[in-house]
Amino acid sequence: FYRQDYDLALDNLKIVVDKGSPAQAEEANYWQAICKWKKGNAQTGIDELNQLLDESNSKDIRSKCFLSLAEIAGELKDYDTALSYLEEGAKLTKERAQKGVIYGRLAEMAFNKENYDLARDAYENVIANSLSKEKIENAHLQILKILRIEKKYRSASRKIKGMLTDDKFNRIAGNLELELVQLYKVQGETSEIETRLESIVSDYPRTLVSAEAYYLLGKVYTSEKWDLNKAKEFFDQVSKESSKSLFSPMAKTRSKAIDTYLNAEKDLEQHFSIANIDTLAVNPSDSDTSTAGISVIVPNRTVPELYYQLADLEAFNFNRMDKGIEFLNKIISENPNSPFHPKSMFTLAFIYENSGDSIKADSARNLLLETYPNSEYASYISSGVQVELKE
């Protein structure tokens, strides 16, 4: 079986069924069903496992059948059925360690399927049965996430504060602090967030916890505080704290976005300086110093292109939709001859649509269709409308 020679395994299992004891025959029947599934006959395997469930009184055999049926259902992407089978299999399993493993699988699958009641119950069983300290700690953290998702903030806060005072949970104290930050965030207690994160990076340096805290600090400074230089410092610190952090690649992406944003702002200022110099040259006043001899490098990108880049970053990197819309409207109102004029209309419609403002989205689309009926953007919108109508 483990060498995947299922035909030979089936031949040997048939001998066990014919000549073995009733208990051995039942075990062999189970493995026959598994072999047939592994050979590609999933339905045959399902039928034989269900038949064995009907006939057997052995809790061990029945547990194995339920667990294998759960695995087959998962393979067939029938996750609700898989959850049901896992639950039944876990209840019948006698061995505590195995019970903990099964409930762990059940909890993870239920959580991913957003069946939070089942997931929480399963994680409680992981805590009760698992022999792994790490799995027990993770189960506690997952229960806290579920409480937050279900908006049971007071229960979550009480659980966190209780665990923080218990030496048994010292290993995950930093994770508990981070979960407390998430509670502050969802409850709008922004004043507490930065203080708590600064405490975390100080108390748990060079860890996955401090890496995540630096990432969250960077997000604070690209949203509420809007200080991109400070945010970049925090994002750049993430990989220094832990190169293994899941937040490291995201932090690098955000840091690059900040560089792009600051460079675009710098080029815009250069354009404005050139325009100001040109104005002074045409309309000098007695108080003006001479502009002769001043050498100014003209940026490669135009003002509309720079506005568009800023709009793109504001809306899609920093989630500041209003600022993104503001830059797009500047292009639309001030730069009608730019190639970024139709592109800005299209992007504006996209942002409004994603924000759920269908009236403004329709208005932006209609303006684009009227102004640039032969553009690729108009063609895309028209084809999209036709597909929607056909559906």
Residue map of PLM features:
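Acidic, polar-rich low-complexity tracts and alpha-helical solenoid repeat scaffolds
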Residues: F1-E391
